[in-house]
Amino acid sequence: KAILSEVALLTNKPVIYAANMSDEDFSNGIDSNEGYKAVQKIAAEEHAGVLPLCAQIEEEIVEMDKEEKEMFLADMGLEESGLDRLIKECYALLGLISYLTAGKQEVRAWTIKKGTKAPQAAGKIHSDFERGFIRAEVIAYDDLIACGSMTAAKEKGLVRSEGKDYVMKDGDVVLFRFNV
């Protein structure tokens, strides 16, 4: 498997099926949909994933503001949109995670492989960050949101100083310290 992963054969890539259905079929319950059952059967044979969604509903959701979107999803018995679920499933299937960096002018998400250590994650931003890595100041996204600011999070002792062996976690908010 390790040798084949270097070749990048299309037939050896992980697969997830996005099963698009009408809004009526989606609303009435996906398990009663014969087309969805057929896709599930194929996916099971191929050891692939299946994600049911409705492109028509997704198109409507994109046009909504945050509050309206949350109400709409709750009425449908969903916690998140199909697009959000598809992105999460694809990240999981490919073994990817995201971490965030935040400055005065920009907040940015960076995609890395699960299991990446802090210096290599810093290298995604710039090779100098990896080469001169000193430490990473890290806080979980949810903790930062709960505190309201990095300053408040530091006062509560929630910002950790991590070294070269720190394995990045999905949702980490990071400030890399480096010297070149």
Task: Locate the predicted segments by residue.
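C-terminal-of-GTPase-core extension/linker across diverse P-loop GTPases
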Residues: 1-169, 174, 179
